Amino acid sequence: MRLYTQVVAASLVATLAIVDSKVSNAIAGQGNNLRFLRQDNATVARVSEDGERGGLLADEKDIMAIADHLIRLNYSLSYARKVLGKFANYEYAIAKVEEKIKKRTVSYMFLDEKFLTQEEAEGKFIEWILEGKTQEQLEREFDIFTRPESKRAKKIQEVNKFAIRAYLDWLRNLRARSFRMTMMEYTNPSNAFATFDRHGHSRNKILSMFDAWVAKGTLLDVVKDRLGFNKPMKPADMFHSDNFVAYATYAQMLREKNNSLRPPRLDSVSTPSN
């Protein structure tokens, strides 16, 4: 019996480690690098055109594994609906996602003497990405490695550790999307790196435009409007939108220019020793 349990457990671990290309292809173009899971080729399959239901069919267990993955990576409810909606039998998973998201709407991060909700924290994630914040900077700013002296301090530290991990997930997601778009430029130049003014533009064209805008000192807020972020959006929806990689790219280019124009810090100038 024990051996049987070990075999089943090992099988489950192997199952959850498999990337299902069929499901990934079903959500291609959504602008993310999620890994989607399956049990076997027969479990996840597209319903035939003659079938009564559209989308993909999968076991409830597999769909819930995907839902849990979306929750772990801090995707918004609207984005979870978009992804899970690719399945014909997704309603139960959506209900579970809604339930779990409601439970984590408080104590997501502690900043400026108050606990933030998930949406407020993710708004900070957007700011950090545009500022180029690194893991080391955040760990230093949040004083992650100081031993907490009270239960409240310990809770604050644990909450902020989780927030930093969530932010790093966003950075990994952004790097993967940026890399994929870079590869698209060489494999299929018709794929757009960004879309605005009713047209899709290639990566080379966008970077050329960005170079000109940086030289003129075009503000980030102006580029934000050009890329279609002028309407109120939830931070997670903004992050997962198709133009966000371009937006973050311009922010980085602008930072690099501004940093190059700053005079050197006095404490960083080496002095000859006597």
Curated annotation (Swiss-Prot):
Signal peptide: 1-21
Chief location bin: secreted
Record gene name: RXLR40
Source taxon at top rank: Eukaryota
One GO location term (cellular component): extracellular region
Family: Belongs to the RxLR effector family.
Function: Secreted effector that completely suppresses the host cell death induced by cell death-inducing proteins.
Residues carrying a glycan: 41, 74, 258
Coiled-coil residues: none
Designated name of the protein: Secreted RxLR effector protein 40
Residues spanned by motif RxLR-dEER: 35-53
Compartment list: Secreted; Host nucleus; Host cytoplasm
Keywords for this protein: Glycoprotein, Host cytoplasm, Host nucleus, Secreted, Signal, Virulence
Transmembrane segments: none
Domain notes for this protein: The RxLR-dEER motif acts to carry the protein into the host cell cytoplasm through binding to cell surface phosphatidylinositol-3-phosphate.
Taxonomic source organism: Plasmopara viticola
